[in-house]
C-alpha cells in the first residue's frame, strides 16, 4: 500500500509487464528495490533480465519463463484452459540455489505453480523458440492455436521459424536437442485450440505487438553469426505491415 515516494525495500520484486512497459515499471519500482531485493521477470524473450540488470545490477536478478498458459483476455475478463507455470533459475547453469528454491516455494505456497531448474537460460531459449513460432504465426494468419495445430501452411511457418531459433540458440551456446524441440511442439499442440497467444490478441485490439522481442531479437542476434533467418524476416515484415495499417 506504500507509494513509490514512501517506499521501503522489499524481499522480492516481480516484473510482469509488456516489454514496452518494463522501463517505466522499473522506475516506479526503484524505491522498493534495495541491495538484497531479488528481482524476477516473467516477460517473454531473453532480454528483460539484461534490461533489469543494467538498471539495478545483475547480482539479484533471477531468470525465469512463464509457459504453458493459454489465457485470453477480452475487456476485463480473463479465461483459460491451462494456467501454465513459472520456471525459474540462476543465470549460470548448475544446481538449484537456495534463493531460487525459496522463491519457488513461496510461489507454490501462494497458488502459482513454479519449477526451479538448473539450466534456466537454455530453457528461456526454448520458450523463445516456441513464442517466435506460435505467437507470430497465429497473428499473421489471424487465427488461434488451432490454426497451427493442424497440417497446413501456418504450421509449416511456425515450425520453420522455430528451426531458425534452434540454430541460433546453438550458436549462442544453448543447444536445443531434437527431443526438446519436439517437447515444445507438443506443448503448443496441447493448448486449447480456441485460445490465442498474446500477439494475436494485440493484433485484434490494434495494439503494437512484441514482434521486436521475437523476430526482431532473432534477426539482430543472427546477424552477428552470419545466420540467415528468412522466415523470421518475413514474419517481422508482415507484422510491421499489419501494424502500420492500424
Question: What would you call each of these model-derived segments?
Answer:
Residues 6-7, 79-82, 192:
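Short, flexible turn/loop "capping" segments at secondary-structure junctions
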Residues 10, 83-85, 198:
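Short, solvent-exposed beta-strand edge segments and adjacent coil->beta transition regions
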Residues 10, 22, 48-49, 100, ...:
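A general structural signal for well-ordered alpha-helical segments in protein cores
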Residues 31-32, 54-60, 75-179:
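Internal alpha-helical scaffold of NAD(P)-dependent oxidoreductase catalytic cores
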